């Protein structure tokens, strides 16, 4: 198969153009030397640089906006090795936004965030995608977060695609149990979006918890 982005085959794009159109946020991001948050986000402007080219005022404005978009403006002057994992994740996402991509790929972007921060980040990404007309693809094991925010879900199992579609179509108990190998229940809220929970112990034949009185 082939992948097209903005009318171009991605395999035919040179490295610089590909970096301008596609941004990636990995699970873990390492640094060779300490940087302040704004300096780290400024690296997202690298695909637009030229030989002997210094950062422009536009670059700094884009960095400032990217930090603001993920709620990380207060971290701008903080050193990356001195902030928490959740704060660092926000800054890493801001660097990707500074690339101003058409396609944003995120691998477990909520990994180090508490539940409130997860919701806030995903709400921001959904709003930004709508406002800026770019596509966000998120790899996640957070079933309920995916159901709450995704327009389309791709359910993968052992390297194969089992089903693609809106969460309400993809979230079928038998499919989810096949993938996650756990007894699950799927319920649908008033908005039609599914919610997944683990089936009760007694329902799956485990009885009461031996550590607790019956």
Where are the language model's segments positioned?
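Conserved catalytic motifs of ABC-family nucleotide-binding domains
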Residues: 100
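Conserved ABC ATPase "signature" region
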Residues: 42, 57-75
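Catalytic Walker B motif of ABC-type/P-loop ATPase nucleotide-binding domains
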Residues: 104-108
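ABC ATPase nucleotide-binding domains
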Residues: 179-214
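Conserved ABC transporter NBD signature motif
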Residues: 1-9, 18
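Conserved ABC ATPase signature
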Residues: 53, 79-83, 87
């Amino acid at each position: 198969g082939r992948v097209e982005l903005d009318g171009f085959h991605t395999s035919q794009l040179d490295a610089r153009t590909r970096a301008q159109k596609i941004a990636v946020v990995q699970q873990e991001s390492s640094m060779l030397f300490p940087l302040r948050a704004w300096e780290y986000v400024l690296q997202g402007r690298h695909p637009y640089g030229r030989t002997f080219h210094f950062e422009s005022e536009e670059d700094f404005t884009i960095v400032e906006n990217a930090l603001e978009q993920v709620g990380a403006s207060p971290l701008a002057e903080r050193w990356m090795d001195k902030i928490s994992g959740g704060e660092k994740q926000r800054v890493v996402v801001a660097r990707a936004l500074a690339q101003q991509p058409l396609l944003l790929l995120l691998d477990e972007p909520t990994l180090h965030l508490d539940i409130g921060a997860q919701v806030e980040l995903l709400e921001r990404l959904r709003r930004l995608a709508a406002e800026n007309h770019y596509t966000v693809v998120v790899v996640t094991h957070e079933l309920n977060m995916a159901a709450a925010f995704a327009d389309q879900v791709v359910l993968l199992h052992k390297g194969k695609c089992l089903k693609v579609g809106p969460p309400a179509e993809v979230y079928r108990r038998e499919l989810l149990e096949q993938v996650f190998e756990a007894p699950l229940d799927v319920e649908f809220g008033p908005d039609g979006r599914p919610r997944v929970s683990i089936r009760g112990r007694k329902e799956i034949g485990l009885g009461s918890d031996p550590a607790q009185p019956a």
